[in-house]
Structure formats: structure tokens, C-alpha cells
From Swiss-Prot:
The keyword Nucleotide-binding applies. The gene is rox. Its cofactor is FAD. It comes from Streptomyces venezuelae (strain ATCC 10712 / CBS 650.69 / DSM 40230 / JCM 4526 / NBRC 13096 / PD 04745). InterPro entries: FAD-bd, FAD/NAD-bd_sf, RIFMO-like. Monooxygenase that can modify rifampicin, thereby inactivating its antibiotic activity. Inactivates a broad range of rifamycin antibiotics. Belongs to the rifampicin monooxygenase family. Rifampicin binds at residues 196, 213. Its EC number is 1.14.13.211. Gene3D superfamilies: 3.30.70.2450, 3.40.30.120, FAD/NAD(P)-binding domain. It comes from the Bacteria. It catalyses: rifampicin + NADPH + O2 = rifampicin para-naphthoquinone carboxamide + NADP(+) + H2O + H(+); rifampicin + NADH + O2 = rifampicin para-naphthoquinone carboxamide + NAD(+) + H2O + H(+); rifamycin SV + NADPH + O2 = rifamycin SV para-naphthoquinone carboxamide + NADP(+) + H2O; rifamycin SV + NADH + O2 = rifamycin SV para-naphthoquinone carboxamide + NAD(+) + H2O. This is Rifampicin monooxygenase. FAD binds at residues 12, 31-32, 98, 122, 156, 277, 290-291. One of its GO terms (molecular function) is oxidoreductase activity, acting on paired donors, with incorporation or reduction of molecular oxygen, NAD(P)H as one donor, and incorporation of one atom of oxygen.
Length: 476
């Protein structure tokens, strides 16, 4: 019997598997595809996901396989510069294809002891008071104490649970693919600049070796959304919008996506959870989807591990839905707004022109970037200091950096006074006596995901706060 079965071997499922293995949880990842995807799909990590990788000691591996960029334009393609000041030590976007992200996360999870089985499709699940039985397409049955559905927008887990997935269907569709072209870079740039004055869902990005990532509006919404478009469809739509097909040829892969926006009503049904696209879908505007899923996993992983290990306080697992559902709701809303701003209709275009003026203000630009990159997220962990509920940035300490102390996925008390104690919780909370010129509060208590749940200097207040997030103290 496994502790946790993760259904889906994409970025969300693999991130979750790694988080669980940090705590010794016996985890199995079931992936229906027999081979890892060769499609680049999502193209990068935003600031909060970069911080997540840094907190687990993975960032250097990602930096070696990608490149950093500090450019704006993430909100509806509005031309903006990168803000001068962001509350982060990692003020950039990391351009790295999803295929590399999945590879690195899989290597991390398996190195920690996670088991990944490919070519295994889930067809049924049943819960009881002791665990969950899952049925596979090949007739095999497996048992686990918990199951997490990370199996995408068409999630089998969500459907088997009967969880409602309200929202709006696709009204417009976009073609996306990677291919070669005979047109020169000069011709491409000239035409693209002109077309994008009125059509934001159009572009071609060089990927190297003569390959371009091409995006162009589809003629309509396909009846069969699972069917890949043809190269002829791309050529037809390129000619319709640009007057040329740029001589595209030799496609690596072709796909389509719509602007459907939906969210699961519940992220938890007893022993089964939903994360990533299984819990929410939205257009890829702003590049938030993969990042949102990684952050779901980062929130759920330590909580589920605490439950398996037996020290989770009552109600801890319920905080997953309470914290992550509102975050996704905001993301869905901002993608809806972006889609409106990208419309070619006169009304939305007028609003877009107004927004283009507003983003020239530094505070407006920074607000939008903080929203897209998820560093403005604040969970409701109770009243008190302004830091409560916020993630702590990667502070420079007298010796090293804060995130270097969080690689093991434990809680952390950063104590600048040297007078506090975590006695009774040493098995799950590290006590770091360090000074940081960037922190203006005597001490902060961080959850394993880096969010602040206490700030101050009073030992009795700390002792009162610890059980709410780290369970009862161990007698000793």
C-alpha cells in the first residue's frame, strides 16, 4: 500500500512527488502516456516558481538549462518594462521549455525515491475510511492512503469524484506549434510588428536551429478539440492574418488551445485531492498555468506529508482548498481580463489603449507583474503582523541566504535575537539564529512552503502559534 498515489506525471504531479519524498512519504506517480512529451508547451517559470526551486535547491539545475530575461509584456501583451523594484531576490523570468521542467522535476523526484510508472491509465477509484482503491485500464488495482489528481484539464480523477467544474467554454481558439520557415528574420519581424498592432494572438518566436514557435488565431472552435491541427490550417490562417505563410514547413508538433475558463468547486473530497489543471483551466495568457500548478503542489505537499507522518494539526489538509482556491479564482479573473484586452473589437481596443497608458506608471506596472508572477499572494493565516500569510523572500543572511536553509522542506524559525526556542518541535522545525539587514522584525516562523505564520519576539506567543501549523509538541 502506498501512502500517496499521484495521478499525472506533468510538472504539478512531479513537483508534488518530490515534496512528498522529502518527508519519506511512499509515493507512486501514474502517468497514462508511455513517453515524456517532446512538446515545449509552457515556456518559463515566473518569480514565485523560481523561488520555489531555490527553496528546494533546484534552481541551479534550471538556470543551466534555460536563460533569464527581465522583460515586461506579460499582461495581455502590453508593452512594458520590467519593474525597477520587486520584493524578490530573483527579479527575472526563467525561460525554460516545459519538457525540460518535467525532466528536471522527474530526476529530482526519482532521486529522492519516488516511483513513476508510465503507460498506466486510471479508470476507477473508490474511497473508504482507510484509503483509496484505484483501478487501472490494464485491470491492476492499487491502494493508497491518499490520491491526488494532477491529470490535467480533462481530469479522470475529477470526473470520477463527480466534482463540478463550472466556468465558460472556449469561444475563440488559437493554433500553436513549432516548425521551420523559409522567410527571413527581417520579413518575419516586419510583418509581425504590423499584425500585432491589432491582433495579439499572433507571433513567431525563434527557438534556435531554424525552428520557430508559431501562434495564430484559428478560424473557429474545432468540434473535436483533441484533434491536432494540420500544417495546411496553419498556412491558411497565417495568410489570412499576415498575407503570407512565411514558407512554414517541417512541423515538430502542432496543437490548439481555447480560452475555456473553469475551476473545480472543491479541491478535496475526503482522501482525494485535485491540483494543477485538474483543479483549474484558463487561457495561457500571462504564462501562469504551469506556475499555478507547481505552487498548488508546493502548498499541498508538506501538508499531506504531515498527515501521513502523524503530526498534522486538525484541519491542516482543509487549508489546501481554503488557500489555493481563491488564488486560482484570481488567476482566472486576470486571464479573462487579458482575453478581453486582446480582442479586436472597438470597445476592448479602447480599453487596451487606456491600459497601455496606465502601465507606464511604475506602481501599476509593478502591481500587474506581482499578480502575474504570484509574489503578491497572501494566505489568510490570522491577524497580526503585515508579513503574516506572505511568502518570505530569499533574504541575505550574515552567513549565506535564507532559501539555502530550506532545502529539506521543514519549517523554519529565523531568530535574530538568539533568545527563542523550538523545543518540542525540533523534528519538524529548524531553528536558525541569524541576522539579516533585510528583515525588520526580531523573528519569523515560516511554514515549509516559506509563508510567514508568526512574527515577533515573545516566546510565549511563539509557543501558542506553533501547534496551529506544526501540531503538538513532542514530549521530551
Amino acid at each position: 500500500m502506498f501512502d500517496v498515489i499521484v495521478v499525472g506525471g506533468g510538472p504539478t504531479g512531479l513537483m508534488l512527488a518530490g515534496e512528498l519524498r522529502l518527508h519519506g512519504v511512499r509515493v507512486l506517480v501514474l502517468e497514462k502516456e508511455t513517453e515524456p512529451t517532446r512538446q515545449s508547451r509552457a515556456q518559463g517559470l515566473h518569480v514565485r516558481s523560481i523561488e520555489v526551486m531555490a527553496q528546494r535547491g533546484l534552481l541551479e539545475r534550471f538556470l543551466e538549462r534555460g536563460h533569464t530575461v527581465a522583460v515586461g509584456g506579460f499582461f495581455a501583451g502590453l508593452a512594458t518594462s520590467w519593474p525597477e523594484r520587486l520584493d524578490t531576490a530573483h527579479s527575472y523570468v526563467l525561460a525554460v521549455p516545459q519538457v525540460i521542467t518535467e525532466q528536471l522535476l522527474a530526476e529530482h523526484a526519482t532521486a529522492l525515491g519516488a516511483e513513476i510508472r508510465r503507460g498506466r491509465a486510471l479508470v476507477g477509484l473508490r474511497q473508504d475510511e482507510d484509503g483509496v482503491t484505484v483501478d487501472l485500464a490494464d485491470g491492476e488495482q492499487l491502494r493508497a492512503r491518499y490520491v491526488v489528481g494532477c491529470d490535467g484539464g480533462r481530469s479522470t480523477v475529477r470526473k470520477l469524484l463527480g466534482v463540478a467544474f463550472p466556468g465558460e467554454p472556449s469561444r475563440v481558439e488559437t493554433l500553436l506549434g513549432e516548425m521551420e520557415m523559409t522567410a527571413s528574420q527581417e520579413e518575419l519581424t516586419s510583418v509581425m510588428t504590423e499584425v500585432r498592432k491589432t491582433q495579439q494572438r499572433f507571433g513567431a518566436m525563434p527557438l534556435g536551429d531554424g525552428v520557430f514557435r508559431v501562434v495564430v488565431p484559428a478560424e473557429g472552435v474545432a468540434e473535436d478539440r483533441t484533434a491536432s491541427p494540420t500544417l495546411d490550417e496553419f498556412k491558411q490562417q497565417l495568410r489570412a492574418h499576415a498575407g503570407t505563410d512565411f514558407g512554414v514547413h517541417s512541423p515538430r508538433w502542432l496543437s490548439r488551445f481555447g480560452d475555456a475558463t473553469r475551476q473545480a468547486e472543491r479541491y478535496r473530497v475526503d482522501r482525494v485531492f485535485l491540483a494543477g489543471d485538474a483543479a483549474h483551466i484558463h487561457p495561457p495568457t500571462g504564462g501562469q498555468g504551469l506556475n499555478l500548478g507547481i505552487q498548488d503542489a508546493f502548498n499541498l505537499g508538506w501538508k499531506l506529508a504531515a498527515e501521513v507522518d502523524g503530526w498534522a494539526p486538525e484541519g491542516l489538509l482543509d487549508t489546501y482548498h481554503a488557500e489555493r482556491h481563491p488564488v486560482a479564482t484570481e488567476v482566472l479573473d486576470n486571464t479573462r481580463a487579458q482575453i478581453q484586452l486582446m480582442s479586436t473589437e472597438p470597445g476592448p481596443q479602447a480599453v487596451r489603449r487606456l491600459m497601455a497608458e496606465l502601465v507606464e506608471f511604475e506602481n501599476v506596472n509593478r502591481y500587474l507583474i506581482e499578480k502575474i508572477t504570484a509574489i503578491s499572494v497572501r494566505y489568510d493565516v490570522g491577524e497580526g503582523h503585515e508579513l503574516l500569510g506572505r511568502r518570505m523572500r530569499d533574504l541575505a543572511l550574515k552567513h549565506g541566504r535564507l532559501y539555502e536553509r530550506m532545502h529539506e522542506g521543514r519549517g523554519l524559525l529565523l531568530d535574530q535575537t538568539g533568545r527563542l526556542s523550538v523545543a518540542g518541535w525540533e523534528d519538524r522545525v529548524d531553528h536558525v539564529v541569524e541576522v539579516s539587514e533585510e528583515l525588520d522584525v526580531p523573528a519569523v516562523l515560516l511554514r515549509p512552503d516559506g509563508h510567514v505564520v508568526w512574527a515577533g519576539e515573545d516566546q510565549q506567543e511563539l509557543l501558542t502559534r506553533m501547534p496551529a501549523w506544526f501540531g503538538a509538541a513532542t514530549a521530551g
